C-alpha cells in the first residue's frame, strides 16, 4: 500500500507492506518483479526446440522434447548432444511423432490444417495436455484426457489408432500446462544459455544466402546493403571458423603498404592478437573454478585471490570426457600358454573400458591370470585374479558404467567385451566371443577385437575340454599383456605437435607476419625498417640486377666467378685477352618491362 495521508514520516503499515514502499522490498520492487516474470518464456507446443520455428517433420526425445528432424539431424552431425539439456543424444534415440490434422493433407502443403486429437478431433492448443504413445521408433499423439478416459481407466492398453499394445511407461508427455518442464522453458535451454543462436532451418539458410532485399530499387543504398550483408557473412564465417577478431584479421591481411607507419600498425595488430590468444581458455580447463577466491575471502590463512581461474583437469579426466572422440586405434598382444593374440582397441566409443584395460595391463594385473570359463561356440571369459568369476576390480577400485554408444556389435568371432553382473558393473573381467552373439548387444561394452591369432590361438582355446561348470580342464593362462600402441598417448602426442605448430605460427605472426604478408604485389620483400630489398643499392650491394623476381644475375655471376677462379688464373697467363665491343643500346618505347621501377 502507498501513502494514505500526507504525513512527514512513514507509518508502520507502510514499512511492513510488500509494495514499492516496503522497507524489505525497496523502491524498484515493481521493476524486479517485472524482470522475474519476463525471464520465463514458454515454447509453443508446435515449435521445434532447436530452431524455435514451427516444425514440419516432428520427432521427439524419450523425455518429450520436440524437434524438427532436419534441424536436429544437422545439429547431431556436429555435436552429438541434446541442444536443450546438453546430454548425449544420437539419431537412433529420436522417436517419430504422428500428429493428426483436421485439414486435407493430400494437398502439396503438408502442414495444412490444425493439429488435433485423432479420436475426439479436438484442436491442440498451448493449454492442452498432450502425450505420445511410443511403439518402438514411432509414437502416436493424443490428448491426455483421451488416453486417460479410454485406455487407463478401462485398462484397455491398446493404441486407439493402430491397435498396438503399450504400457504406462510408453506414454511420453509432450506438453503439460500444469507442469512446464525445462523442455518447454526457453530460459533453461542449454544452447541458449551458452550464447548460441537458434539453429536455422533450410528455408532460413536459403533466404539468408539469397537475400530478400530488392537491391535495384534501392539505387546507391543497395550497394551499401550488399556490402553490409557481405561483411556480416564474413564475420559469421570467421566466428564459426575460430572466433577470431574479424576487424583485426581483415586489417592485418589487407595492409600491404610499404611505409614504416603501416608496418608499426601491423606489429601492433599482431601483438593484440597474441594477447588475445594468450588469454585463450586451456583445452583441459574444467567448467568450475579452483575455489581459491571464495576460500581466500573466508580464511585468513590463505593469500587473497580475485582471479577466479578455472580448475585444470588431469590427463585422465581430460581424455575420458564424453565430448572427446579419440579415433586412434590401440594394439595389445596377449601372451598365453597356447599362443599369442593381438587385440585392436576401440577407444572411440568405449574410452573408459579401453583406459581401464590398458592401465591394468600396464601394471601387470592380468599376468598369470587364468581363463575361468569357456563355452564352445559361445565365448571364453577371464580377467579375474581369484579365478572364481566373482572377483576382479577396475583401475579406479570400483565398478564403472557401461558404454553402449556407437556402431560396435557382437557380429563376428573374436569380439572382446567387458563381463558384468548387471547394469554398470564393469570391473576387470572380459570375454572373447567364439561366434557372433547379437543377443549380447547393448548389454556388454565392446572395447576391442582380435585381429591376429583367431585361427590358431583362439581355436586352440575353444578346443580345450571343460568340466560341468564350463571350467577348462587344462589351464589357459595369460602370461603377459604387452602394450604395442597406447591410443591415448598417441593422441596426446599429436595434440602437442599441433599445439607446437600453432605456437610456431603465432611466433611468426608476432615477428611481423608470414612470407606473404611481407611481400608486395610486385614480388619485392619488405624489410623490418619499411624499405624494400634492392632499393637504394648498387651493383656492389645486396640488390644487384635481377631477371624478374626469381633469378639474381649478380649472384649467378658471383657463383660462376668463385668456382672458376683457379682456371681463369691459369688461362690468363697463356691466352691473350680481348675487349668485347660496346653494343649500342636499342631504343625502347613505352615503359618496358617495369624492371627499373
Swiss-Prot record:
Residues 495-521, 560-597 are annotated as: Disordered. GO terms for biological process: protein folding; protein ubiquitination. It catalyses: [protein]-peptidylproline (omega=180) = [protein]-peptidylproline (omega=0); S-ubiquitinyl-[E2 ubiquitin-conjugating enzyme]-L-cysteine + [acceptor protein]-L-lysine = [E2 ubiquitin-conjugating enzyme]-L-cysteine + N(6)-ubiquitinyl-[acceptor protein]-L-lysine. Pathway: Protein modification; protein ubiquitination. GO terms for cellular component: catalytic step 2 spliceosome. Keywords: Isomerase, Nucleus, Rotamase, Transferase, Ubl conjugation pathway. One of its GO terms (molecular function) is peptidyl-prolyl cis-trans isomerase activity. Residues 328-483 form the PPIase cyclophilin-type domain. Residues 495-519 have a biased composition (Basic and acidic residues). InterPro entries: Cyclophilin-like_dom_sf, Cyclophilin-type_PPIase_CS, Cyclophilin-type_PPIase_dom, Cyclophilin_A-like, PPIL2_U-box_dom, Ubox_domain, Znf_RING/FYVE/PHD. Residues 41-114 form the U-box domain. Its EC number is 2.3.2.27, 5.2.1.8. It is found in: Nucleus. It comes from the Eukaryota. It holds the Pfam family U-box. May catalyze the cis-trans isomerization of proline imidic peptide bonds in oligopeptides thereby assisting the folding of proteins. May also function as a chaperone, playing a role in intracellular transport of proteins. May also have a protein ubiquitin ligase activity acting as an E3 ubiquitin protein ligase or as a ubiquitin-ubiquitin ligase promoting elongation of ubiquitin chains on proteins. Belongs to the cyclophilin-type PPIase family. PPIL2 subfamily. This is Peptidyl-prolyl cis-trans isomerase-like 2. It comes from Neurospora crassa (strain ATCC 24698 / 74-OR23-1A / CBS 708.71 / DSM 1257 / FGSC 987).
Amino acid at each position: 500500500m502507498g501513502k494514505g495521508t500526507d504525513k512527514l514520516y512513514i507509518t508502520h503499515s507502510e514499512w511492513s507492506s510488500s509494495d514499492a514502499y516496503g522497507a524489505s522490498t525497496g523502491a524498484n520492487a515493481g521493476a524486479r518483479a517485472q524482470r522475474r516474470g519476463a525471464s520465463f518464456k514458454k515454447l509453443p507446443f508446435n515449435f521445434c526446440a532447436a530452431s524455435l520455428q514451427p516444425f514440419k517433420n516432428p520427432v521427439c526425445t524419450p523425455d518429450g522434447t520436440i524437434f524438427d528432424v532436419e534441424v536436429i539431424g544437422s545439429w547431431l552431425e556436429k555435436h552429438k548432444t541434446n541442444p536443450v539439456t546438453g546430454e548425449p543424444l544420437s539419431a537412433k534415440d529420436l522417436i517419430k511423432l504422428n500428429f493428426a490434422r483436421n485439414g486435407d493433407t493430400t494437398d502439396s502443403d503438408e502442414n495444412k490444417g490444425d493439429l488435433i486429437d485423432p479420436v475426439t478431433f479436438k484442436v491442440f492448443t498451448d493449454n492442452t495436455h498432450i502425450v505420445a504413445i511410443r511403439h518402438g521408433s514411432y509414437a502416436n499423439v493424443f490428448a491426455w484426457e483421451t488416453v486417460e478416459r479410454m485406455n487407463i481407466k478401462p485398462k484397455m492398453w491398446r493404441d486407439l489408432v493402430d491397435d498396438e499394445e503399450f504400457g504406462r511407461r510408453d506414454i511420453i508427455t509432450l506438453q503439460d500446462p500444469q507442469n512446464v518442464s525445462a523442455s518447454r522453458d526457453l530460459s533453461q535451454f542449454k544452447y541458449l544459455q551458452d550464447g548460441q543462436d537458434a539453429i536455422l532451418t533450410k528455408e532460413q539458410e536459403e533466404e539468408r544466402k539469397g537475400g530478400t532485399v530488392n537491391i535495384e530499387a534501392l539505387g546507391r543504398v543497395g550497394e551499401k546493403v550488399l556490402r553490409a550483408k557481405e561483411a556480416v557473412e564474413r564475420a559469421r564465417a570467421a566466428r564459426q571458423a575460430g572466433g577470431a577478431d574479424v576487424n583485426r584479421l581483415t586489417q592485418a591481411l589487407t595492409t600491404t603498404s610499404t611505409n614504416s607507419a603501416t608496418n608499426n600498425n601491423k606489429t601492433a595488430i599482431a601483438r593484440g592478437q597474441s594477447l588475445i590468444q594468450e588469454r585463450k581458455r586451456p583445452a583441459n580447463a574444467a567448467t568450475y573454478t579452483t575455489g581459491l577466491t571464495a576460500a581466500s575471502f573466508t580464511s585468513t590463512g590463505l593469500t587473497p585471490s580475485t582471479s577466479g581461474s578455472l580448475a585444470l583437469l588431469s590427463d585422465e579426466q581430460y581424455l575420458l570426457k564424453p565430448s572427446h572422440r579419440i579415433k586412434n586405434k590401440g594394439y595389445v598382444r596377449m601372451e598365453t600358454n597356447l599362443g599369442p593374440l593381438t587385440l585392436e582397441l576401440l577407444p572411440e566409443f568405449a574410452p573408459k573400458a579401453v583406459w581401464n584395460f590398458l592401465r591394468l595391463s600396464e601394471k601387470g594385473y592380468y599376468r598369470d591370470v587364468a581363463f575361468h570359463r569357456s563355452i564352445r561356440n559361445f565365448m571364453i571369459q577371464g580377467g579375474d585374479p581369484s579365478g572364481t568369476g566373482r572377483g576382479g576390480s577396475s583401475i579406479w577400485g570400483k565398478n564403472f558404467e557401461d558404454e553402449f554408444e556407437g556402431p560396435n556389435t557382437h557380429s563376428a568371432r573374436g569380439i572382446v567385451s567387458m563381463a558384468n553382473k548387471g547394469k554398470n558393473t564393469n570391473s576387470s573381467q572380459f570375454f572373447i566371443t567364439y561366434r557372433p552373439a547379437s543377443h549380447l548387444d547393448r548389454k556388454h561394452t565392446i572395447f576391442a577385437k582380435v585381429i591376429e591369432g583367431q585361427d590358431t590361438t583362439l581355436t586352440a582355446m575353444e578346443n580345450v575340454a571343460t568340466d560341468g561348470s564350463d571350467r577348462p580342464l587344462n589351464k589357459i593362462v595369460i602370461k603377459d599383456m604387452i602394450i604395442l600402441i597406447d591410443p591415448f598417448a598417441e593422441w596426446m602426442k599429436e595434440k602437442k605437435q599441433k599445439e607446437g605448430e600453432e605456437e610456431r605460427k603465432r611466433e611468426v605472426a608476432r615477428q611481423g607476419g608470414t612470407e606473404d604478408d611481407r611481400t608486395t604485389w610486385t614480388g619485392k620483400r619488405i624489410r623490418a625498417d619499411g624499405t624494400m630489398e634492392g632499393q637504394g643499392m648498387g651493383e656492389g650491394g645486396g640488390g644487384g640486377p635481377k631477371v624478374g623476381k626469381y633469378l639474381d644475375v649478380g649472384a649467378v655471376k658471383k657463383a660462376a666467378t668463385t668456382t672458376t677462379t683457379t682456371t681463369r688464373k691459369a688461362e690468363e697467363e697463356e691466352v691473350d685477352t680481348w675487349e668485347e665491343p660496346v653494343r649500342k643500346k636499342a631504343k625502347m618505347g613505352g615503359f618496358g618491362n617495369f624492371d627499373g621501377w
